[in-house]
């Protein structure tokens, strides 16, 4: 029988404390502080951030001291730009590290032509588009990377993302249709698909069978509208407060969670809200997000 408490683990991404795209943001927050805040708030783990140690033994000790786990870590693939062989070599090392820290998923985003880290490119109008041959290469490459992930006891979860070539529902459709479900799974990110398409449920319902990892990111509609009008970049949009933790924005997480539980989702739900930690206290917002999810989960416990 499906048991929500045993099937779903709650985690948080370090991106509320530190940001890998803008390293000076939140640099006063050490990885140990992030782990301690996550444990204090009652999360089961965090994803790996850029400030985390690359020595598995060091990280494993700090995790053990706090009773935490690592669900996964982001990997920027450049399959289209650099070719499959190059991506495989880098991903092999990535997966070896994730295996050593007992992770569950390798989160992959194809970053060829990505504008997510370009400060003066409007993320709402200037996203890249792949050609047919580039799509074919990408899907072949992801299948190859997925085999590597499986060999390390991991699942490759592809992250649809604003400012990339796989952002919209039709693009996710194409990726799912042309990759092998044995090797390529999907990360469902509420915030990215909401900003991109204006709705979260179509992607969730259409591709639930491929979803092996979930990010709960909320969106402030008034901030989003202002950033669209001002043609802001992805980085400036999050610095302006477009994203926040569940319950602090406008996404209907009650419906999202009802669907996940109703279809017996098993895996991690990771709160991910890239914000400026000077404006939005990371611990305070971690607690706010956790409280909202806990309230919603009460209906199923």
From Swiss-Prot:
Its EC number is 4.2.1.44. This is Inosose dehydratase. It is an enzyme of class 4 (lyase). GO terms for biological process: inositol catabolic process. HAMAP family: IolE (MF_01672). NCBIfam families: myo_inos_iolE (TIGR04379). Keywords: Cobalt, Lyase, Manganese. The lineage of its organism: Bacteria, Pseudomonadati, Pseudomonadota, Gammaproteobacteria, Enterobacterales. Signal peptide: none annotated. Belongs to the IolE/MocC family.
